[in-house]
Amino acid sequence: MLKELSSVQAYLPFIHAMLADPDFRDPMLATPAQLHQHLLDAHEDPAKRLFGTFDGGTLTGLFSVLVLPEEGYLQLLAGLSRQAAAYDALLSHLQAAYPGYQADFVYSPRSRLLHTALADRHAAFDPEQQKMFLRSPPPYVPDSRVQLYTPVFRAQYLALHDDDRYWTGERVLAAQDTFRVLLAIEDDAVAGYLDLTYRNAENEPYDLFVREKSRCRGLGRALLSCAIEKNRPIAMSLRVDSVNLAARRLYASLDFVEKPEENNITAHLKL
């Protein structure tokens, strides 16, 4: 049975037991800040919904979901269960309660139960993402081709931006409290960009892109080096497609180290 919850405080032993299990931990709850934001304090945010699944009086699953009705969008922020029936109950509820919504699910590659439930509903799956953490980067060398975003480059930035994701170029520019944008400029034109989160305990180069004709000129490294410098002294991590060996080598050259236990997969499902 699925129930909507007003809080998860009564279920802390269940939460900590799940997070200690490498086969069932949730990468969206990898840090204390994420644990509070996505689950423990989710009841304080009216855009978040908390659900529990129960077998008799026994808790079998806990879930936190971000719901944005004005955008017809939702995202699973936390999913903790060892039972396939719990994931099926959650997905069935979401399909009934939010028909037509676009839903994203971020989860561990080891979470076969959720993966199977999504595959049964014909979800689309992104490649596995490798988690990497910045350790001790080399000294910063400024590059005159890299600068902070200014509105004069708005049209070029938006034209270049990868919009096959929730954080489109328009949304990034509108979220000035979440992102800062770095641009790589060649011949007065935008040749690349990096969307960098900030104001967090740990920030992330969320999207790094260099146009094809400008590649192999050090622009990706220059953008990332500038992002690291502007982020100091805050911690930094990122995710990259596991199959993208060139990008992983670039990040490793700046002393990002891999942490495979925090890898994830994103699935997309039209409810």
Regions found by a protein language model. Give the residues of each.
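C-terminal "cap" of GNAT-fold acetyltransferases
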Residues: 127-148, 239-245, 258-271
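Conserved acetyl-CoA-binding loop-helix of GNAT-fold acetyltransferases
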Residues: 83-96, 210, 216-229, 248-253
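Acyl-donor-binding surface of acyltransferase catalytic domains
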Residues: 70, 78-142, 265-267
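Conserved hydrophobic beta-strand within the GNAT/NAT acetyltransferase core sheet
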Residues: 103-107, 205, 236-240
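Conserved active-site alpha-helix within GNAT-family acetyltransferase domains
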Residues: 109-127, 221, 243-260
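Active-site rim helix/loop that mediates acceptor-substrate recognition in acyltransferases
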Residues: 27-50, 161-193
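Short amphipathic alpha-helix that is part of the acyltransferase structural core
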Residues: 1-34, 129, 138-167
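Conserved donor-binding loop and adjoining core beta-sheet/short helix segment
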Residues: 30-89, 194-206, 212
